[in-house]
Amino acid sequence: MHHIQTADLRFSADNTPVSDRFDDIYFSTQDGVAESRYVFQQGNALWERWSACQDIHFVIAETGFGTGLNFFAVTTLFRQFRRQNPQSPLSRLHFISFEKYPISAEQLAITYQTFSEFSALAAQLQQWWQINGIPIEGCYRYHFGETTLDIWFGDVNTQLPQLGDYMQNRIDAWFLDGFSPSKNPDMWNETVYRLMYRYTKPQGTFATFTAASAVKKGLESAGFRVEKRAGFGKKRECLYGEKPAENAPHFTASQVNTPWFLPQAAKFDGAADVAIIGGGIASLFSALSLLERGADVTLYCEDDELALNASGNKQGAFYPQLSDDDERNIRFYIHAFAYGLQRLQWAVAHNVPFEHRFCGVALCGYDEKSAAKLDKISAYQWDKKLYAGMNREELAQTVGLPLPCGGGFIPNGGWLAPRQFVQNAFRLLESSGLSVKTAQKITALSSTKNGWTLQNAQGETFRHNIVVLANGHRLHRFEQTARLPLYPVRGQVSQIATGENLLKLNSVICYDGYMTPADEAKTSHCIGASHVRDCENREFSTTEQQENQAKIQKNLAMDWTHDVDTSDNRARVGVRCAVRDRIPMMGNVPDFDRQTEEYRNLFNLRRRKQPVLVAANFENLYLVGALGSRGLTSAPILGECLASLIYGEPLPLSEDIIHALCPNRSWMRKLLKGTPVK
């Protein structure tokens, strides 16, 4: 995990931002906005191409986010285009940018004091940077209405490859910005140019402010057709060009580095007709992201009400999983947490009523093993907005009650009422066109020429083009998902009465369990949860109730824990869906029989460097599952990632994380080693 260094930025006498690190200005001192419009918008002929575009989204990629001027300018242009062309099929703009040294939220605010036309957009981005910071490298997704911004923080040489096989032939236009090639040579290199070519659509374009001969030769060597035109202001010339259609290699499996993990977009015409099977938080965020893209979405819930299973607790903790031996899993949860904060703020802004407090989450080093894990976490130089290590006195002062140990604190974490949130958010989505069908137990799926037929327990059938399975521990009950290595985990959460001491708790505390602060009525707390693998029984357990009380009194052996009393037997039992490697599943539903047959000799094919087929999946069938005990944190980014995949848009996670989420990953680990899968 690499942490992000911020920019060495100062403002000149005329308020132009200047980089001390690169000894260069961020944009023209003559007119930065005019320069952006001339070099990048006109250089890529954006308005003309948008007017002729028959696709529903257009993808721009940029090297060097800087102050965000190019993004704000093109977002403003796209909004103007949409107002003037409301009937155009092009309804969404996707902007990808790379930045190694981001400016701070405060510097962003100063920069846009002189650009009033972009002040609202800049203020929105500034708000997210102030709340969340930029804790680690990787992709951070932000929504600006019809425009989506993905900023990949880190070195472009390491981040650009993480767009991966999936992004081959998907980018429409490039803004080659960043500082002068002579002052920032690490960014202007043949590896970047080759990846640009790979990711660019046939007849996709690029534009840049420079006319340096090394840049021109590098782009031509990669395969682009390069032209010169008059430069902006004092610059004599600048470059623009395209990826020739006649030279563009056909997309074949042999060009894909990891075809067994290649995500596959849905096939549909017109509006996507999507069925979601489920009724909890994974279904909610999948539905939200699909509706935002204009999909027709129908939800089929087995229960009589929504959020009756794992999403049905009175209070649940919201924070990233940091104590994992797999560094990739930690990165996933940090990015999921950052995106989840945005989605919860979206709910607040849309007046979704739900109890919540962003009161922070304390991680307690209650024994030798947990303390060692927290020491390992603290060894990273985290952004303080994400995590801060604390000694016993500091942690106790932060949470409001005495503690026997130190640990760490996640200031933007907190708690929310999952059932209340999910049910009320679904009501909001219904007003936006979501169709909800409860008491619909879907028992079978069958593929048809135009999509899928769903059959319920009464024998009724429903037809949809695309199906998303998000039904928790019931996910593997279909013929198509029966071989997935999922298992149920029963969890009992105890609800306890508050008291004078317990009311002092002002943050969620985690030990070998967790306890929330009092609810908004100041009457009760939640503690939990039990963990019983391979159990779907939802009956109340006196033993588990007593264990929940015993754990906090053992792990945090302070006088106030004696006020924790579960004897009134108030509790709720849910069943979670889990998987052994502790990271969710998201993506295409794999065809087990075909994949194990076609990849049975994969080990030797790779050793001999022979072509390998793209993975055989069930067309237009997707899943989100195995969220375990971190569904509140992971569901928002998983739902967004799934919707992006269905629509063939850029994905908000790095390729290595996408691979880790692939539902066929456990089979592929064996097949890649030459081990048979049974």
UniProtKB/Swiss-Prot annotation:
Q: Which UniProt keywords are present, listed alphabetically?
A: Cytoplasm, FAD, Flavoprotein, Methyltransferase, Multifunctional enzyme, Oxidoreductase, S-adenosyl-L-methionine, Transferase, tRNA processing
Q: What is its EC number?
A: 2.1.1.61, 1.5.-.-
Cofactor requirement? FAD
Locate the region FAD-dependent cmnm(5)s(2)U34 oxidoreductase: 277-678
UniProt cross-references to InterPro entries, sorted A to Z: FAD-dep_OxRdtase, FAD/NAD-bd_sf, MnmC-like_methylTransf, SAM-dependent_MTases_sf, tRNA_MAMT_biosynth_bifunc_MnmC, tRNA_MNMC2, tRNA_S-uridine_synth_MnmC_C
Q: Which Pfam families match?
A: DAO, Methyltransf_30
Per the record, which residues fall in region tRNA (mnm(5)s(2)U34)-methyltransferase? 1-244
* NCBIfam families for the chain: MnmC_Cterm, PRK01747.1-2, PRK01747.1-5, tRNA_MNMC2
This chain belongs to the protein called tRNA 5-methylaminomethyl-2-thiouridine biosynthesis bifunctional protein MnmC
Organism of this sequence? Actinobacillus succinogenes (strain ATCC 55618 / DSM 22257 / CCUG 43843 / 130Z)
